[in-house]
Amino acid sequence: MRYLVDTHTHTIVSGHAYTTFLENVQEASNIGLKVLGTTDHGPSMPGGPNLFYFNNFKVMPRKLKGVTLLHGCEANIIDFKGMLDIPDFTQKKLDVIIASLHDVCIRPGSMEENTEALINVMENPYVDILGHIGNPSFPINEEVVVKKAKEKNVLIEINNGSFVSRKGSEETCKKVANLCKKHKVNIIVGSDSHVCFQIGRFPKADNMLKEIGMPEELIINNEENKILEYLKNKGKLKDLNLD
């Protein structure tokens, strides 16, 4: 399958990534991506950016080198109540927010606690995507989370990076994907790139989705406008006109 969108990418601003914003945009353009999301880690990530970085996206272009740019954040869930490490004032300015659990920002809890964190964060209207929920460090009740995502119109990410960096993720990712297929929940495939050469490349996630027969209509990033329409329907991207 050809993917035209990558919403989960990091720059050197995240502290442990290796390429700049412009290098990422150039690579996205080179490989034919139509939409690129820059979603650096929230400020509670060691080495991550401060809030001024996220509050200053107004200086950034909307399009560059033929690529539509989404300026967002992979925000850290910092408690089981679903609080994020960026305030509402910042959240409402962003084009896209991925909410993720990272063990350097919150201790892994019980299955019930981890599930509660994800259920609660989906009550936040600014959250668009749940990041890498197949991480075995944070066991969850996958079906409860997937059903809640459908109710709240939140996208479930299938994170290609998890297949390599989070050992044991493949089985859980497949379970999550099958549940999304069963309940007709939209998914988005993300590279979680920390260097530009990973952008737009989802081989392991794509192979798994082919294996389970994931319907293409449930995959948001196989067309340019699906993600843009999704975000505009949530009241975002007011400055962007869709052709």
Curated annotation (Swiss-Prot):
Cofactor note: Binds 3 Zn(2+) ions per subunit.
Cofactors (names): Zn(2+)
EC number per UniProt: 3.1.3.-
Gene Ontology cellular-component terms listed: cytosol
Residues reported in the UniProt entry to bind Zn(2+) 2: 16, 41, 194
Family statement: Belongs to the PHP family.
Binding of Zn(2+) 1, residues: 8, 10, 74, 192
Protein name, as recorded: Probable phosphatase CLI_3563
Source organism superkingdom: Bacteria
InterPro entries named among the record's database cross-references: Phosphatase_YcdX_put, PHP_dom, PHP_phosphatase, Pol/His_phosphatase_N, Pol/histidinol_Pase-like
EC category name: hydrolase
Molecular function (Gene Ontology), one example: phosphatase activity
Keyword Cytoplasm part of the UniProt annotation: no
UniProt-annotated binding residues for Zn(2+) 3: 74, 102, 132
Matching CDD domains: PHP_HisPPase_Ycdx_like
Keyword line: Hydrolase, Metal-binding, Zinc
